[in-house]
C-alpha cells in the first residue's frame, strides 16, 4: 500500500515538474527534483534483493546437507 502511494506521488511530481518545464522552457531543475526519490527506491530495492539472495543461499546450504 505504501509503495503504491509513493509511486502515485512520484508520478504527480513528475507531471507537475514537466508542466513547469513547459511554462519556463527549462529542464535543468527537473532532474534535481526527480532523481533522489528514484535513487532511494532503487537503493532499497537493491538491498532487499541482495538480502533475499543471501538468505536463500544460507537456507540452501543449511537444508542441503541433511
Curated annotation (Swiss-Prot):
GO cellular component assignments: host cell nuclear membrane; membrane
Predominant cellular place of this UniProt entry's protein: host cell
Positions of glycan attachment: 7, 24
Residues of the signal peptide: none
Compartments (UniProt record): Host nucleus membrane
Key word Membrane present: yes
Topology of this chain in the membrane: Single-pass membrane protein
Designated name of the protein: Early E3 7.7 kDa protein
Record field: transmembrane: 44-64
Record keyword Glycoprotein present: yes
UniProt keyword annotations, A-Z: Early protein, Glycoprotein, Host membrane, Host nucleus, Membrane, Transmembrane, Transmembrane helix
Annotated organism of origin: Human adenovirus B serotype 7
Organism superkingdom: Viruses
Amino acid at each position: 500500500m505504501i509503495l503504491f502511494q509513493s509511486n502515485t506521488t512520484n508520478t504527480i511530481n513528475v507531471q507537475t515538474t514537466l508542466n513547469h518545464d513547459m511554462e519556463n522552457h527549462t529542464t535543468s531543475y527537473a532532474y534535481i527534483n526527480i532523481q533522489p526519490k528514484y535513487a532511494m527506491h532503487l537503493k532499497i530495492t537493491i538491498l532487499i534483493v541482495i538480502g533475499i539472495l543471501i538468505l536463500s543461499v544460507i537456507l540452501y546450504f543449511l537444508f542441503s546437507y541433511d
